[in-house]
């Protein structure tokens, strides 16, 4: 399919659709007064509340779903749990809620972990671990190759490729000298 043909067909069609009412997200018909969404929501919600349902016509009178605050449901006024000792002239708050006593200032005994069988000090374990790591690092295969890459300015493999191609650091060019 030719892309120019597709563009020339679909572009006018899209322009026509977007200029008509059907192409918009919320089309407003001509002559219709536009109300904001919040006003529409308020109007709809009041209509739903005021219109009785068929099942409610013979039933009990309408009661709101959310209970109103009564004297029984009101929480008690805020009372601090521990009175402050900063100002002694202030009268104590009314005792609507019982006060929680302060914790004692005595501290418990310090925690001593139970002794382990064959327990060694940590320093001995650290030294043994260091020795083990050092031995394994010294014996690792290919360690010498990694630390000394070769005589060239790159690695061994790149130096070999450079020597063969005549473009490496250690390559001798015999073509220029005659």
Swiss-Prot record:
Keyword Disulfide bond appears in the UniProt entry: yes
Segments of this protein annotated with the region Disordered: 69-107, 135-155
Disulfide-bonded cysteines: 153-169
Residues making up the propeptide: 26-58, 69-73, 85-89, 103-112, 123-146
Similarity-based family: In the C-terminal section; belongs to the natriuretic peptide family.
Function: Helokinestatins antagonize the vasodilatory actions of bradykinin at the B2 bradykinin receptor (BDKRB2), with helokinestatin-1 being the most potent antagonist.
Entry protein name: Natriuretic and helokinestatin peptides
Organism encoding this protein: Heloderma suspectum cinctum
């Amino acid at each position: 399919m030719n892309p120019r043909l597709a563009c020339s067909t679909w572009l006018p069609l899209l322009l026509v659709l977007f200029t008509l009412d059907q192409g918009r997200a919320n089309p407003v018909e001509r002559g219709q007064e536009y109300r904001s969404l919040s006003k529409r929501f308020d109007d709809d919600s009041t209509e739903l509340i005021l219109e009785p349902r068929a099942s409610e016509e013979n039933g009990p009178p309408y009661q709101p779903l959310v209970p109103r605050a009564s004297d029984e449901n009101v929480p008690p006024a805020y009372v601090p749990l521990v009175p402050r000792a900063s100002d002694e002239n202030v009268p104590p708050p009314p005792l609507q809620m019982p006060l929680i006593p302060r914790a004692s200032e005595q501290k418990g005994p310090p925690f001593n972990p139970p002794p382990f069988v064959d327990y060694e000090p940590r320093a001995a374990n650290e030294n043994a671990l260091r020795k083990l790591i050092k031995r394994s690092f010294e014996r690792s295969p290919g360690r010498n190759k990694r630390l000394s890459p070769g005589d060239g300015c790159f690695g061994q493999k790149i130096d070999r490729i450079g020597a063969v191609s005549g473009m490496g650091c250690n390559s001798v060019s015999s073509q220029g000298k005659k």
